Curated annotation (Swiss-Prot):
GO terms of molecular function: toxin activity
Protein name as it appears in the record: Consomatin Mrc3
Residues bearing the modification Tyrosine amide: Y69
Family the entry assigns: Belongs to the conotoxin C superfamily. Consomatin family.
GO annotations of cellular component type: extracellular region
Keyword match Acyltransferase: no
Subcellular location: Secreted
């Protein structure tokens, strides 16, 4: 519990320190995430890890509440 508390405190300091130097919150948050991490890349990574009977699972692309596959 004590470790989790200090991790939380350090994260707050890590985020707020650049803000006190005049940085914008959006820029600070973007600086914490690597450039190659995008929603598309994350989805591809998750799909490539999931296997079923040696075949890749098919993940339909659905838009909002309409899904042509189900």
């Amino acid at each position: 519990m004590q470790t989790a508390y200090w991790v939380m405190v350090m994260m707050m300091v890590w985020i707020t320190a650049p803000l006190s130097e005049g940085g914008k919150l959006n820029d600070v948050i973007r600086g914490l995430v690597p450039d190659d991490v995008t929603p598309k890349r994350i989805l591809q990574s998750l799909i490539s890890r999931r296997r079923f009977d040696g075949r890749a699972l098919f993940v339909p692309s659905c838009i909002w509440k309409t899904c042509p596959y189900g």
